[in-house]
Amino acid sequence: MKKSIILLAFVLGAFTANAQSVVEGTKFTDNWSVEVNAGAITPLTHSAFFKSMRPGFGVGFSKQLTPIFGLGFQGMGYINTTPSKTAFDASDVSLLGKVNLMNLFASYQGEPRLFEVEAVAGMGWLHYYVNGDGDQNSWSTRFGLNFNFNLGETKAWTLGIKPAIVYDMQGSFPETKSRFNANNAAFELTAGLTYHFKTSTGNHYFTKVKVYNQAEIDGLNSSINALRSEVNNKDGELNTANRQINGLQKDL
């Protein structure tokens, strides 16, 4: 009977394992989004913080690989950040990695939370525009946070507040090699509106579902019922044996 009970426990464990939750909406065409950003940028050092702020605008698109990790491509343009008379004084085109800290530490619940925090890091091509010849190229790194508010019942729209530090890695080239230098960095603060396209599941986000195989469930139910019958039969045999023992003891 002990063997039967142990086997029953294994069957129940197998049933539980076959009812695990999985995430749907993981096709390549799923979980893409497009965004527009607007805000301001100011030198990190040696300037009046608010007085030196200049406008910045940009667009981007992202692909969420998992509920935790995503990749993004972003282009930003900045106005009046240098003495240049061009419409845009600088542009920064970046490849970004994103980590959803809420899903990382508190797990994904099946749909986006109302408020979430993303950590963002990346690098890109930084270009300075001047009148006539003499445009300059550099490369940038970016570190920031996105404070996201997921709007509506369908969570199709996200409003984000995005502070970031942007480094011009070659700001003092050729005197020094590429490096992180606060004197060649800027603080950027933007607000962004993101639209999340529908996935193959019809939602605008990863869908968490439980996967069942009905044939396996029916087979497991049959096994469980057979084991229950076997346990009941063993209990009956044990009760009969106990009665016989009691009768023999009385005869003695």
Specify the residue positions occupied by each region the protein language model found.
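Bacterial Sec-dependent N-terminal signal peptides
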Residues: 1-22
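Short loop/turn motifs that connect adjacent beta-strands in outer-membrane beta-barrel proteins
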Residues: 20-31, 68, 103-117, 151-157, ...
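Short glycine/proline- and aromatic-enriched beta-strand/turn motifs that initiate or cap beta-hairpins
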Residues: 20-62
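Residues on the lipid-exposed face of transmembrane beta-strands in outer-membrane beta-barrel proteins
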Residues: 36-40, 59-63, 95-101, 121-125, ...
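Transmembrane beta-strands of outer-membrane beta-barrel pores
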Residues: 38-44, 75-81, 101-103, 123-129, ...
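Outer-membrane beta-barrel translocator domains and adjoining extracellular loop/strand segments
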Residues: 46-53, 82-89, 110-111, 128-138, ...
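Gram-negative (and chloroplast) outer-membrane scaffold detector with strong preference
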Residues: 67-141, 153
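Predominantly the C-terminal beta-signal and adjacent terminal strand-loop region
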Residues: 84-85, 152-248
